[in-house]
Amino acid sequence: FEQYPSNDITEGNFYKTDDDFNQGVVSCYAKLKTMMSFHLTEIGYRSDENILESMAVSTQDRYDIDNFIETASNGILSDIWDAWYNGIYRCNDVLDHMNGVQIPNYNKYRGECLFMRSWWYFNLYRTFGVVPIARTVVPPAAAKLIPRCTEEEMYSLLTEDLAEAARLLPDTRNAEKARVTGIAAYTLLAKVYLT
C-alpha cells in the first residue's frame, strides 16, 4: 500500500486521468517555447539567417557558433543541449507512464509526444551530429553512460517515431489549433528524408 500526501502531486499519484496526461503533454509543448524564443535564434548564427556584426556587441560563445567552433565550454551550446534533452525527458516521461493505460485521448497524446521527441532529436542531430538516444526515462548517472548513436540508429528512431505519430495524430485540429497534427508529422518526416 502506497500512500501519498493528499495535497501534493507526485510521480506516484499523477498520470491517472486523461487530464493528467494532457498536462504532461502540455509540459512538452512548454519546452518548445524555450527553443523557439532563444535556441533556434542562436543556432541561426551558423547560417545567413542571423548576422554577427561585431564582437563588441556579442559574446565569444556566439562568435564560436558563427565560426563552427564547437567546444564543451560554450555556454550557449551547453544550454541548448540541456534544454533539448529536457524536452526529450518530458516526452519520455509521458510515454513511459502511458504503458498499459486506457485513456480516451491515448493515440493523440502518444502521437504528440512521439512527434516532439523526434523534433528534439532531429534538431540535436542537425546541431551536434549523432547524439545519445534514450527512448525511456533514464536516471542521470545512467544517461551519462549512453554512447552516441550511429546515423542509422538516428534515422531509424526518427522515421519510426514520425511514421507512428503521423498515423496516430488527426490531420487537422478544430479547437486545439496550436497542437501538432498528422500532417506536421509527415512534414517533419519528409525533412528527415531530405537531410
Predicted regions and their residues:
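Bacterial Sec-dependent N-terminal signal peptides
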Residues: 1-19, 158, 190
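Short linear capping/connector segments at secondary-structure termini
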Residues: 7-10, 68-70, 136-142
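Aromatic-lined, polymer-binding surfaces characteristic
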Residues: 130, 176-187
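TPR/Sel1-like alpha-solenoid repeat signature
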Residues: 114, 186-192
